[in-house]
Structure formats: structure tokens, C-alpha cells
Amino acid sequence: MTATTYIPKSVFIDTNVLIDHLQMRSGHENADQILALGKNHTIRLCLSALSMADIVYIMRKTIDEKNIKNTFNDWIRHFIILPVAEISISDACRSGNPDFEDAMQLSCAEMEFCHAIITRNKKHFEPYTDIPVFTPEEFLGKIVRNS
């Protein structure tokens, strides 16, 4: 029996997963693996410009400015950086999602027709979209690597 490989074409990665990677928080190994999948073009990895602004704000006291700029330049080369448009703000206002920032992230993912969302906070995404939502662990568990 052959295992079925689940590899969505386009995947949106939420800010909290990116911060796991940057701060090497618990679970960062999963975030690292997902970013590697994007860098080697196994998946088309998308993140929003809002995530990048949030990361600078959240990590401003713990990360060197040169290092974060180098990281962002690397991400720009390998990943799709989605703009936050007026429609994302309007969508977030109408969504009923209690987390405005996550509602804007979701709008970005939907406008890009992403096939999956990876976040550690599924409750701010799943009730508001038909896009499959995974934790990093769940997402990696869905991918069967052929050796």
C-alpha cells in the first residue's frame, strides 16, 4: 500500500510560528522544518507584511536590527510576502473574529488562495474559514516524505 503525500501548493504561515523560529521557543524545530520546506520549494510559503511588522515590534528588545533585516531579506528571497490591503482591514472588521490581527492575516491568506494555514492559535482561524488550519506539528504529520 502506497502512502498518500499531502503537500498543499500554497501555505500561509502565521506570525506566532515565525516567532517560534526566531526566538527558538518550544516547538521551534517544527517551525524550522516548515521554513525549510518553503526554502527548498517543496511548498509555496506565504506570510504577510503585517507579520514582519509585528515581529519587529514584538522582538525589538531581544533581536539585533542587522540580524532581523538579514532574516527578512532571506524571507523575501524565498517566500511570498503578502501585502495588507484595504480589503483585509474591511474583511477583519466584518469577520466576527475576536482577534483583529488574525482576521487580517486570514484575509491575506484567502486573497492569495492559500491551501492551508499554519498557526499555533487555531481558534482564531478555523471558525472563520474553509481553508484547512494546522498547528506546525499537525502540518508536518500530514506530509509523508518519500525516502
Which residues are covered by each model-predicted region?
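Alpha-helix capping/helix-boundary segments
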Residues: 17, 51, 88, 105, ...
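Short, well-structured N-terminal submotif of metal-dependent ribonuclease cores
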Residues: 1-47, 60-67, 127, 140-147
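Short amphipathic alpha-helical segments and helix-helix/interface helices
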Residues: 32-35, 72, 105-106
